[in-house]
Amino acid sequence: MARVLVVLSVVVASLFFSQGATFENQRLFNNAVIRVQHLHQLAAKMMDDFEEALLPEERKQLSKIFPLSFCNSDSIEAPAGKDETQKSSVLKLLHTSYRLIESWEFPSKNLGNPNHISEKLADLKMGIGVLIEGCVDGQTSLDENDAFAPPFEDFYQTLSEGNLKKSFRLLSCFKKDMHKVETYLSVAKCRRSLDSNCTL
């Protein structure tokens, strides 16, 4: 009887531990999603403010340029479209999000925003790193070979009225990448929860 009670106690304790780990995991995912949503909203606001300050002719000209432009993050392998995102593993979504955030580590310093975007990105990157470590149970999360090239020179340009094309490109790419990360983290969070419906 005593042995049965000991075994039962161990089982109950393990269940509580597992449940606690699940709650902590969800808390970390919630925090990461909230942070990237804030960054995405901030990027959209900066983009709107920038476009409102343009003359109609300038706005028309720039809207034709960006679809043909190349973002720094385009060199990062990432799920394309809803179907591919849905089929990607949680670990792949986290790795991709980590690399996208990392790609803005230096360019973000030129966004000229008083809200310390670089610090917000650094905090989010750290949080995603913790989530990756949790997914791989302490194994190496990112290979050294996965480190990618420094941002293109264009991305080091500061926002200025005399450089509308580069400023527009910088803001457009930032908004685009924050949207990507928000999507990837939201799907990853859903996958790690009890919700069985994670459609986009």
From Swiss-Prot:
UniProt entry tagged with the keyword Transferase: no
Gene Ontology CC entries for this record: extracellular space
Entry annotated with the keyword Isomerase: no
PANTHER family the UniProt entry points to: SOMATOTROPIN, SOMATOTROPIN,PROLACTIN
Subcellular location: Secreted
Signal sequence range: 1-22
GO molecular function: growth hormone activity; growth hormone receptor binding; metal ion binding
Entry superkingdom: Eukaryota
GO annotation terms (biological process): animal organ development; growth hormone receptor signaling pathway; hyperosmotic salinity response; positive regulation of growth; positive regulation of receptor signaling pathway via JAK-STAT; response to L-arginine; response to peptide hormone; response to starvation
One Pfam family this sequence matches: Hormone_1
Family: Belongs to the somatotropin/prolactin family.
Organism for this UniProt entry: Heteropneustes fossilis (Stinging catfish)
Function: Growth hormone plays an important role in growth control and is involved in the regulation of several anabolic processes. Implicated as an osmoregulatory substance important for seawater adaptation.
PROSITE patterns according to UniProt: SOMATOTROPIN_1, SOMATOTROPIN_2
Record's protein name: Somatotropin
Disulfide bonds: 71-173, 190-198
The entry's keywords: Disulfide bond, Hormone, Metal-binding, Secreted, Signal, Zinc
Encoding gene, per UniProt annotation: gh
Binding site for Zn(2+): 38, 182
